[in-house]
Amino acid sequence: MKKLLLPALLTFSATPALAAKGPFFSLANTDFIVLISFIAFIGVLVYFKIPGILSGMLDKRAEGIKAELEEAKALREEAQTLLASYERKQREVQAQADAIVATAKEDAEAAAAQAKVDLEASIARRLATAEDQLASAQAAAIKEVKDKAVTVAIAAAADVISSKLGKAELNALNADAIKEVKAKLH
């Protein structure tokens, strides 16, 4: 390909020179001089193997670009893998956060329900305690009224008995009462 390029290039460069006026192979013809200079320049380039050096440099540059493209492709794949990993982790963290929120909500609802049950139990206990205190106070009042009635009845009976019985009969009744109390206590 390189060998075909040089003759084709020379052929196309000589075409304008052939169209010039006057003898072509004269040193007065600038087209001929330019053609000779160009051929000499190309010859120098070929002699010093500049086309091979240039193609080698271009090949190295192409290989460098290819390596950079492969590296960029690998980096892109790695970045996509990392992105997918982070997105997956984000979804997992979001799912965990949602689960924590749901659990906290359930716990709060359960705590509220338990607090309501505890409050109702506390109210029931206080109500029962109040009812017990009321019943106790009522029983104490009834007992006090009965005791007072017994005391009044005893006092009235004592007055009636003392007014109707004599001193000897009262002493006999007191002695019998003391014996009865002793018998019941022992």
UniProtKB/Swiss-Prot annotation:
Q: Is Transmembrane helix found in the keyword set? A: yes
Q: Which GO terms describe its cellular component?
A: plasma membrane; proton-transporting ATP synthase complex
Q: Where in the cell is it found?
A: Cell inner membrane
Q: Which residues cross the membrane?
A: 5-25
Q: Which UniProt keywords apply?
A: ATP synthesis, Cell inner membrane, Cell membrane, CF(0), Hydrogen ion transport, Ion transport, Membrane, Transmembrane, Transmembrane helix, Transport
Q: Which domain of life is it from?
A: Bacteria
InterPro entries per the UniProt record, alphabetical: ATP_synth_b/b'su_bac/chlpt, ATP_synthase_B_chain
Q: How does it sit in the membrane?
A: Single-pass membrane protein
The molecular function terms of the Gene Ontology recorded here are: proton-transporting ATP synthase activity, rotational mechanism; proton-transporting ATPase activity, rotational mechanism
Coiled-coil intervals: none
Looking up CDD domains in the UniProt record yields: ATP-synt_Fo_b
Protein's UniProt keywords contain Transport: yes
Q: What does this protein do?
A: F(1)F(0) ATP synthase produces ATP from ADP in the presence of a proton or sodium gradient. F-type ATPases consist of two structural domains, F(1) containing the extramembraneous catalytic core and F(0) containing the membrane proton channel, linked together by a central stalk and a peripheral stalk. During catalysis, ATP synthesis in the catalytic domain of F(1) is coupled via a rotary mechanism of the central stalk subunits to proton translocation.
- How is the quaternary structure described? F-type ATPases have 2 components, F(1) - the catalytic core - and F(0) - the membrane proton channel. F(1) has five subunits: alpha(3), beta(3), gamma(1), delta(1), epsilon(1). F(0) has three main subunits: a(1), b(2) and c(10-14). The alpha and beta chains form an alternating ring which encloses part of the gamma chain. F(1) is attached to F(0) by a central stalk formed by the gamma and epsilon chains, while a peripheral stalk is formed by the delta and b chains.
Which NCBIfam families does the UniProt record give?
PRK13455.1
Family under the similarity heading: Belongs to the ATPase B chain family.
Name of this protein: ATP synthase subunit b 3
The taxonomy runs: Bacteria, Pseudomonadati, Pseudomonadota, Alphaproteobacteria, Rhodobacterales
